[in-house]
A protein has these predicted regions:
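Glycine-rich phosphate-binding loop of ATP-grasp-fold ATP-dependent ligases
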Residues: 6, 142-146, 164-182
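Acidic (Asp/Glu)-rich catalytic clusters
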Residues: 158-160
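ATP-binding N-terminal substructure of ATP-dependent carboxylate-amine bond-forming enzymes
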Residues: 1-119, 123-125, 129, 136, ...
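Residue-level signal for beta-strand positions within conserved beta-sheet cores that form or flank
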Residues: 20-22, 140, 174
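Basic phosphate/pyrophosphate-binding loop/patch that engages nucleotide-derived ligands
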Residues: 133-141
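Generic hydrophobic-segment detector
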Residues: 84-87, 163, 167
Length: 182
């Protein structure tokens, strides 16, 4: 899942940063972190990255319920920890990390973060729009068409294409909803 990829990414980055001497911790954007030792919010030398990752995974079965029943997108202490950090490494994958919403929130709150800004993230999340922008600037892209379900043709030859084709949802993450149709 995109959540698991995010946890794996964050774990690897956190370990690398800590190995280089940085005070880094893993924070689950949805479930947050409770309690927080505000005297040492970014962990001491004995901070266990793998234990933090397992703690995050412990919410996997309940994550949709947690998101549905809560008033805020962000879990407890997430924004406060991000504001206290020198910089936030964005390890989120999928719609919640790549669509520009988190980046826009961070921009509004003055939180420094890695990666692209909110506008480029939002534009790139829509693969059809991204393709149009690339084509306008003569960036080579594979042949493709965008269509809505209600306008979908059942005859691939009407589109000037032949099998096999790659079918991708327009606004999913980079590898979500990808199918090869023969």
């Amino acid at each position: 899942t995109e959540r698991e990829i995010s946890i794996v990414t964050g774990t690897g980055v956190c370990k690398a940063l800590r190995k280089k001497g940085h005070n880094a911790i893993l924070v689950d954007i949805f479930c947050g972190l409770e309690p927080v030792d505000w005297d040492e919010p970014f962990g001491d030398k004995d901070y266990e990255v793998d234990s933090a990752a397992e703690y995050m995974r412990s919410f996997d079965d309940a994550i949709e319920e947690i998101k549905r029943t809560r008033r805020s997108f962000f879990g407890p202490n997430v924004l406060e920890l991000c504001q206290a950090a020198d910089i936030v490494f964005m390890g989120l994958h999928g719609s919640n990390g790549e669509d520009g919403k988190v980046q826009a929130t961070f921009d509004l709150l003055g939180i420094r973060y890695t990666g692209t800004g909110y506008l480029s993230s939002a534009l790139a999340m829509d693969k059809g729009l991204t393709k149009k922008i690339f084509l306008m600037d003569q960036v080579p892209t594979p042949k493709g068409v965008s269509m809505l379900k209600e306008n979908c043709t059942r005859n691939i030859h009407d589109l000037g294409m032949e099998f096999p084709v790659v079918v991708k949802t327009c606004c999913g993450g980079s590898s979500v909803g990808v199918y090869i149709v023969n």
